[in-house]
Each structure stands twice: as C-alpha cells, then as structure tokens.
UniProtKB/Swiss-Prot annotation:
Part of the signal recognition particle protein translocation system, which is composed of SRP and FtsY. It comes from Thermus aquaticus. The gene is ftsY. This is Signal recognition particle receptor FtsY. The keyword Transport does not apply. Its main location: membrane.
Length: 304
C-alpha cells in the first residue's frame, strides 16, 4: 500500500466525520450549516471554520467541495508565496524531501506522543536520503528514555550519545554536538524529556538545552521540531503555543493521525503559529512517517 493510501486509510475517522453529514449537492445554506458542524467536530477550530465558510459563501462556486478543498490547502500552506500561487490557480511543485536548515534538530513534545519512536523514524528517513545520522538520548529523566533510543540506534546502525539516568541533558546535548562535528556527521537529532507543557521549570530546562547546543555551535540549532499527537486535538494547539513561546518552533510533526477523528487540528496549528507541518505519521511502521503535502492531505481528507 502506497503512502497516499495509508494516509487515506489513516484519515478515515476524520473523513467520515467531515463527509458523512454534508449534502454537497444541496442548497448552499444547508451545506454550509452541516460543513460548520463537521469542521468544528474535526477540531478545525472556530476562527478557521468561520473563515472557510465565509470564503466558500463568497466564492459563488457551484462545486462547493472543490471550493472547500482549495481553501483548506491554502490554509495548510504557511509559505505565503506558495499559498498565493495556489489561490491564483497554479499548482506549486510537490514538496521536495524535508531538508533541515542546519545539522542539529532539537525534538520536543509532551509525554506519550511517541517522540523517541518518531526520532527513530526520522533517522531511517534521512539514512534513506544518504545522510550520516546521529542521535542524542536527551530524555535523561525517564529510566527507559536512553535505552529506547539506544535500541533503535542498534537496529538502524545509528550512533547514540547517551549518559546514565539523571545526566544533565544540556551537558549531554553539548557533548553530542561536539561529537557530531568531530566525527563528520550530517545530522544530529536531540531527544528531550516528555515535558508537561504546564510545568514552567521543565520549559526552562528545554531552553537550557537549546542554549547548550548554541554554545557548542553558535549556528545551531536551526531546527526545533515539535512532535504532536493528533488525538489531542485542540489541546495540541495549546501545547504547540507553549513550546513555540519557550523555544521557537520551526516545524511540527503530527503522529497518530490514524487513531483520531480530529485530523482537522493541523489547520489551526499552521494558521496560528505560521509554522509548517514537516511530517505526518499514520502508523507504527518505520516508513509510516512521511513529508507533509497539503494537497495530498486534503485530497485524502475529502475524497470518498
């Protein structure tokens, strides 16, 4: 099964919620009323839902489903130039492989989102692109944190920089950057503890890790990626805001899209934070994490 089919299968719950009740061939107001309920239920959020309805109503289009598709694709595109091209009817090139801007990617997120597994999948993805990848097991507050990443490292033949439980994660991140440079690796993914976004001191710890990376290399980290569980819906948006305030996100990875009817939460995340979705995950397999393509996502969301 190709990734589009897996994405489509993964979005089945969200798609059912969006499509089931909408009488696309009915009169405009009837369609918009059902569409509003469906978008809100899929966690698109009130503000984004109102914007979608307003634009669809103003478009005067007969094919309402196509009008909704175009609007959703535009909202999932934080790059204004590409979004404008789409509005003008041009179809920008499909996204190329996701190339991190620098060599260090700091990976953050709350407990239980599958952060460590996602890092392993990222390692596999970049290995397949011919990159030399290294991991830093910075989740030193959790007994199994380093062990889990270490096991993945063995399976993927990726070196893992780690210390005993309770090691200062900032010091470990510093050492990992030095090791990456000394050994000539292309990419370093720094795992972090599954911090609860409501715990201020844990956010401070994250800032400290980011500063330590910058001390080891003033150019880094150019990328800070948040791993978010789609099942959390609107709460995921609140998490993203807190992390963005603390460490300045450059991308979001959304996991477990196959386990929720709240896949619409991607829209307010991009719209509110102006941060792109880098990857989406729709399964447990090592290849079930793929670069995010707004068009393929909306197609999978709205196609019967």
């Amino acid at each position: 099964m190709g990734f589009f089919d897996r994405l489509k299968a993964g979005l089945a719950k969200t798609r059912e919620r969006l499509l089931k009740a909408i009488p696309w061939g009915g009169n405009l107001e009837e369609v918009l009323e059902e569409l509003e309920m469906a978008l809100l239920a899929a966690d698109v959020g009130l503000s984004a839902t109102e914007e979608i309805l307003q634009e669809v109503r103003a478009s005067g289009r007969k094919d309402l489903k196509e009008a909704v598709k175009e609007k959703l694709v535009g909202m999932l595109e934080p790059d204004e130039r590409r979004a404008t091209l789409r509005k003008l009817g041009f179809n920008p090139q499909k996204p190329k492989p996701v190339e991190p801007k620098g060599r260090v990617v700091l990976v953050v997120g709350v407990n239980g989102v599958g952060k460590t597994t996602t890092i392993a999948k990222l390692g596999r993805y970049y290995q397949n692109l011919g990159k030399k990848v290294m991991f830093c097991a910075g989740d030193t507050f959790r007994a199994a944190g380093g062990t889990q990443l270490s096991e993945w490292g063995k399976r993927l033949s990726i070196p893992v920089i780690q210390g005993p439980e309770g090691t200062d994660p900032a010091a470990l991140a510093y050492d990992a950057v030095q090791a990456m440079k000394a050994r000539g690796y292309d990419l370093l993914f720094v795992d972090t503890a599954g911090r609860l976004h409501t715990k201020h001191n844990l956010m401070e710890e994250l800032k400290k890790v980011k500063r330590a990376i910058a001390k080891a290399d003033p150019e880094e980290p150019k990328e800070v990626w948040l791993v978010l569980d789609a099942v959390t819906g609107q709460n995921g948006l609140e998490q993203a805001k807190k992390f963005h305030e603390a460490v300045g996100l450059t991308g979001v990875i959304v996991t477990k899209l196959d386990g929720t009817a709240k896949g619409g939460v991607l829209i307010p995340i991009v719209r509110t934070l102006k941060v792109p979705i880098k990857f989406v995950g729709v399964g447990e397999g090592p290849d079930d994490l793929q670069p995010f393509d707004p068009e393929a996502f909306v197609e999978a969301l709205l196609e019967d």
